[in-house]
C-alpha cells in the first residue's frame, strides 16, 4: 500500500530495521526497467502525470536501445498489505543495474550495496546467460534471492515450466516463484511485500566512524559529479568534510540526500541508507565506483573491500573523417570521460588516417555505445579501426612490451606472446550444441564443461581468446542458433599463443591502419581476404600497384591493381611498325619512371569499408 509522504521516515533518522536494500537482476529485455516503473507508480513517488515508460533510463541511447547503462537508485516508501509488518511504513531502496556483460563491474558494486536481489526472468524465454552470470555474482555477495517470473500476460508465457527451472537453479520450491506482469501491474504489490518479508535489514554500527561505499557516479553539467553511495557504518552529514580512502582526496559535502527518483536534499543519511552526495568535484575519476568514503575527523581506518580499477579489455582507434574535427573529438572524449570512468584514451597518429585517439573500452557494447554517443551527442563523423585486445610480448633479450595497437607489435626475436582469455558461457536450446561447438572450436576455444538446465536447454562453458570474440563472434553465434543463444563472458587471465602481425603493403609501403595481430594458422586466410578486398576498392593508377600481405619480411599473399592503359597508337593509321614500337617503348619508359616515384592514395571510402565491416575478422561474414 503506498505510504503517504507525511509518515515516511527522514533519511537521517530512519531505523535500519525498516530499510530494505535490493536490486533487480535480469537479462536484457526481460522487463527490468518496466518493473521499476510499476514500483514507482505503486509506491506513489512519481506523480501519474509525470510518469513515462522506462522512467529511470535517462540517456537517449538507453531509451532507444532498451538497455540500462548506468545504475540508478530510488528510495521507495512501502507499507506491506499483509504479514506481521502490515501497515508499517518501510523504506525500500531499489538499485536498477545494467544487464550487459560489459558493465559487470558496475553490477557487482551495485550488488555489494544491497542485501537482497529480485531475480527477474521472462516467462516466455526462460533463463539466459546474463541472468546466470549476475545470479552467480549475487550468490558470491551472499544476497537473499527473490525469484520472479515476469511477462505472464504474454500468450507465449510458460510460467509452470520456467518456475521449475528457476526453482532448480536457486534451490527453492516452484510455488515460491512469484509471477508478475510488469506491464499490467499484476502481482507487483505481492512482490514488494515479499521484499519486505524476505530481504534482511542492513546491519551497521550507528555510532562507528562513517563508512560509505560508492556504487555509481554521474556527471551533472550544473552541479559537477553526483556520487551515489550506500552508508555501511555511522552517518554522513551536510557540510561535513569527507575523505576518499583510495586516493586520500578530501572534499566538503555541499549537498546530501536521497533520490526518489528526483534528487531530494536531506540533513544527512544514516546506516543502511542509499543516497547521493555532491561535493562540487568536476571529474568522475575522483569518485571511483567501489571506493570508500569516510569523515575527515575521526574517520575510519579500514576501507570496505572489493574496490578495483576497471581495466579496458578492447582497444580501437577513433579518427575523425575530417582532420579539422580533431580538437572537437578530444573535447568530446574529455566530456564522456567525466561520466564514464572506465573509458581511457591517448592520442595517436596514423600515416593513413591522420590524427586520432586509441581508446580503451570494457567490451564491445561499451565501444558501440561510446561511438554512438560521440556521433550523436557531439555530431562527429568517425572512422573506428578494427577492435583489438592487449598483448604482452616477451622478447628473447628479456624485455617486455605491452601492445595496444597492432602497428606497435615489435619486430625481431620474439620469445612469447601472451593474449587475454575469457571464460564464455553460452545458453541455448540443446539442438544447437553441434553448431555452437563447431563455432567455438573454430575460434581456438577449449571446452570446459556442459550442463543441461532442463531437457531442452543447455549451458556450454568454453575458454576462448578474447581476440576471437571481439569481432563478430556474437553475430555468428546468433545466426547459427537462429537468435536463441545468449552469451556471457568474464576475463580469466591470459595464455601464450602463436601470434603474428600481418602487415598490408601498398606498392611496397606499409599501411599502418590495416595491420592486424592474428593467430599463425589464420594469418594466410586473413591476408588473402584483405588483399582481395583492397584490390576491388583501390582505384586503378597509371602504373600497376602490387598489394601484398606480409608477416615480417615474408609475403604471404598478393594481388595487383592493373594499370590503366592509354592507347598511344590511336593516332597511327597503318604506317611503319618501328614508329609504333617507338611510341610503345616511350610509354613503357614513362610507366617505369612513374612506378619509381608514384604514390598510391587510398581513398577514404576504402578505409571505411575495410574497417567498418568486420569481414576482415570472421570467415562467415564474407560468405553472406
From Swiss-Prot:
<keyword id="KW-0472">Membrane</keyword>
<dbReference type="GO" id="GO:0005886">
    <property type="term" value="C:plasma membrane"/>
</dbReference>
<keyword id="KW-0342">GTP-binding</keyword>
<dbReference type="GO" id="GO:0003924">
    <property type="term" value="F:GTPase activity"/>
</dbReference>
<dbReference type="InterPro" id="IPR000795">
    <property type="entry name" value="T_Tr_GTP-bd_dom"/>
</dbReference>
<dbReference type="InterPro" id="IPR031157">
    <property type="entry name" value="G_TR_CS"/>
</dbReference>
<feature type="binding site">
    <location>
        <begin position="150"/>
        <end position="153"/>
    </location>
    <ligand>
        <name>GTP</name>
    </ligand>
</feature>
<dbReference type="InterPro" id="IPR038363">
    <property type="entry name" value="LepA_C_sf"/>
</dbReference>
<keyword id="KW-0648">Protein biosynthesis</keyword>
<dbReference type="InterPro" id="IPR013842">
    <property type="entry name" value="LepA_CTD"/>
</dbReference>
<dbReference type="InterPro" id="IPR035654">
    <property type="entry name" value="LepA_IV"/>
</dbReference>
<dbReference type="InterPro" id="IPR005225">
    <property type="entry name" value="Small_GTP-bd"/>
</dbReference>
<dbReference type="InterPro" id="IPR000640">
    <property type="entry name" value="EFG_V-like"/>
</dbReference>
<dbReference type="Pfam" id="PF00009">
    <property type="entry name" value="GTP_EFTU"/>
</dbReference>
<dbReference type="InterPro" id="IPR006297">
    <property type="entry name" value="EF-4"/>
</dbReference>
<dbReference type="InterPro" id="IPR004161">
    <property type="entry name" value="EFTu-like_2"/>
</dbReference>
<dbReference type="Pfam" id="PF06421">
    <property type="entry name" value="LepA_C"/>
</dbReference>
<keyword id="KW-0378">Hydrolase</keyword>
<dbReference type="InterPro" id="IPR027417">
    <property type="entry name" value="P-loop_NTPase"/>
</dbReference>
<keyword id="KW-1003">Cell membrane</keyword>
<feature type="domain" description="tr-type G">
    <location>
        <begin position="17"/>
        <end position="203"/>
    </location>
</feature>
<protein>
    <recommendedName>
        <fullName>Elongation factor 4</fullName>
        <ecNumber>3.6.5.n1</ecNumber>
    </recommendedName>
</protein>
<dbReference type="Pfam" id="PF03144">
    <property type="entry name" value="GTP_EFTU_D2"/>
</dbReference>
<dbReference type="Pfam" id="PF00679">
    <property type="entry name" value="EFG_C"/>
</dbReference>
<dbReference type="InterPro" id="IPR035647">
    <property type="entry name" value="EFG_III/V"/>
</dbReference>
<dbReference type="GO" id="GO:0003746">
    <property type="term" value="F:translation elongation factor activity"/>
</dbReference>
<keyword id="KW-0547">Nucleotide-binding</keyword>
<comment type="function">
    <text>Required for accurate and efficient protein synthesis under certain stress conditions. May act as a fidelity factor of the translation reaction, by catalyzing a one-codon backward translocation of tRNAs on improperly translocated ribosomes. Back-translocation proceeds from a post-translocation (POST) complex to a pre-translocation (PRE) complex, thus giving elongation factor G a second chance to translocate the tRNAs correctly. Binds to ribosomes in a GTP-dependent manner.</text>
</comment>
<dbReference type="GO" id="GO:0043022">
    <property type="term" value="F:ribosome binding"/>
</dbReference>
<dbReference type="GO" id="GO:0045727">
    <property type="term" value="P:positive regulation of translation"/>
</dbReference>
<feature type="binding site">
    <location>
        <begin position="29"/>
        <end position="34"/>
    </location>
    <ligand>
        <name>GTP</name>
    </ligand>
</feature>
<comment type="similarity">
    <text>Belongs to the TRAFAC class translation factor GTPase superfamily. Classic translation factor GTPase family. LepA subfamily.</text>
</comment>
<dbReference type="GO" id="GO:0005525">
    <property type="term" value="F:GTP binding"/>
</dbReference>
<dbReference type="InterPro" id="IPR009000">
    <property type="entry name" value="Transl_B-barrel_sf"/>
</dbReference>
Amino acid at each position: 500500500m503506498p505510504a503517504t509522504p507525511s509518515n515516511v521516515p527522514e533519511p537521517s533518522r530512519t531505523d535500519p530495521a525498516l530499510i530494505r536494500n535490493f536490486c533487480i537482476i535480469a537479462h536484457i529485455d526481460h522487463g527490468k526497467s518496466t518493473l521499476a516503473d510499476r514500483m514507482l507508480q505503486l509506491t506513489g513517488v512519481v506523480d501519474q502525470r509525470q510518469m513515462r515508460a522506462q522512467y529511470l533510463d535517462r540517456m537517449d541511447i538507453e531509451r532507444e536501445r532498451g538497455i540500462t547503462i548506468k545504475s540508478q537508485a530510488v528510495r521507495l516508501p512501502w507499507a506491506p498489505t499483509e504479514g506481521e509488518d502490515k501497515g508499517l511504513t518501510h523504506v525500500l531502496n531499489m538499485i536498477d543495474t545494467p544487464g550487459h556483460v560489459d558493465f559487470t563491474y558496475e553490477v557487482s558494486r551495485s550488488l555489494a550495496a544491497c542485501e537482497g536481489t529480485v531475480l527477474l526472468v521472462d516467462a516466455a524465454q526462460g533463463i539466459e546467460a546474463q541472468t546466470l552470470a549476475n545470479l552467480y555474482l549475487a550468490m558470491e555477495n551472499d544476497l537473499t534471492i527473490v525469484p520472479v517470473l515476469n511477462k505472464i500476460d504474454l500468450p507465449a508465457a510458460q510460467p509452470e515450466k520456467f518456475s521449475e527451472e528457476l526453482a532448480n537453479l536457486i534451490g527453492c520450491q516452484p510455488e515460491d516463484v512469484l509471477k508478475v506482469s510488469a506491464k499490467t501491474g499484476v502481482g507487483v504489490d505481492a512482490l514488494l511485500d515479499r521484499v519486505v518479508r524476505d530481504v534482511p535489514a542492513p546491519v551497521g554500527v550507528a555510532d562507528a566512524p562513517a563508512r560509505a561505499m560508492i556504487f555509481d557516479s554521474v556527471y551533472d553539467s550544473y552541479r559537477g559529479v553526483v556520487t551515489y553511495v550506500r552508508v555501511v557504518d555511522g552517518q554522513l552529514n551536510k557540510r561535513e568534510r569527507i575523505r576518499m580512502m583510495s586516493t586520500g582526496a578530501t572534499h566538503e559535502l555541499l549537498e546530501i540526500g536521497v533520490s526518489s527518483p528526483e534528487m531530494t536534499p536531506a540533513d544527512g543519511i544514516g546506516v543502511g541508507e542509499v543516497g547521493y552526495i555532491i561535493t562540487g568535484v568536476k571529474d568522475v575519476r575522483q569518485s571511483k565506483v567501489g571506493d570508500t568514503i569516510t569523515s575527515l575527523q575521526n574517520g575510519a581506518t579500514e576501507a570496505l573491500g572489493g574496490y578495483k580499477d576497471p581495466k579496458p579489455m578492447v582497444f580501437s582507434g577513433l579518427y575523425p573523417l575530417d582532420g579539422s574535427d580533431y580538437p572537437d573529438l578530444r573535447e568530446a572524449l574529455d566530456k564522456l570521460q567525466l561520466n564514464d570512468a572506465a573509458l581511457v584514451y591517448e592520442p595517436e597518429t596514423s600515416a593513413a588516417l591522420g590524427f586520432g585517439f586509441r581508446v580503451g573500452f570494457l567490451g564491445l557494447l561499451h565501444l558501440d555505445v561510446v561511438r554512438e554517443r560521440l556521433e550523436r551527442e557531439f555530431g562527429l563523423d568517425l572512422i573506428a579501426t578494427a577492435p583489438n585486445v592487449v598483448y604482452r610480448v616477451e622478447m628473447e633479450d628479456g624485455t617486455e612490451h605491452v601492445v595496444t595497437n597492432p602497428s606497435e607489435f615489435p619486430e625481431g626475436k620474439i620469445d612469447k606472446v601472451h593474449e587475454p582469455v575469457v571464460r564464455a558461457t553460452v545458453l541455448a536450446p540443446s539442438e544447437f550444441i553441434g553448431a555452437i561447438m563447431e563455432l567455438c572450436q573454430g575460434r581456438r576455444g577449449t571446452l570446459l564443461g556442459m550442463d543441461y538446465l532442463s531437457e531442452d536447454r543447455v549451458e556450454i562453458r568454453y575458454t576462448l581468446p578474447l581476440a576471437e570474440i571481439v569481432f563478430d563472434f556474437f553475430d555468428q553465434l546468433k545466426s547459427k542458433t537462429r537468435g536463441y543463444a545468449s552469451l556471457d563472458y568474464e576475463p580469466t587471465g591470459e595464455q601464450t599463443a602463436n601470434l603474428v602481425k600481418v602487415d598490408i603493403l601498398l606498392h611496397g609501403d606499409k599501411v599502418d591502419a590495416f595491420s592486424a595481430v592474428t593467430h599463425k594458422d589464420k594469418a594466410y586466410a586473413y591476408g588473402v581476404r584483405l588483399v582481395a578486398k583492397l584490390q576491388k576498392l583501390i582505384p586503378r593508377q597509371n602504373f600497376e600497384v602490387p598489394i601484398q600481405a606480409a608477416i615480417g619480411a615474408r609475403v604471404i599473399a598478393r594481388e595487383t591493381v592493373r594499370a590503366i592503359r592509354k592507347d598511344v597508337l590511336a593516332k597511327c593509321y597503318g604506317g611503319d611498325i618501328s614508329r609504333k614500337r617507338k611510341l610503345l617503348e616511350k610509354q613503357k619508359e614513362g610507366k617505369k619512371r612513374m612506378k619509381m616515384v608514384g604514390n598510391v592514395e587510398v581513398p577514404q571510402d576504402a578505409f571505411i569499408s575495410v574497417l567498418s565491416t568486420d569481414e576482415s575478422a570472421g570467415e562467415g561474414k564474407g560468405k553472406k
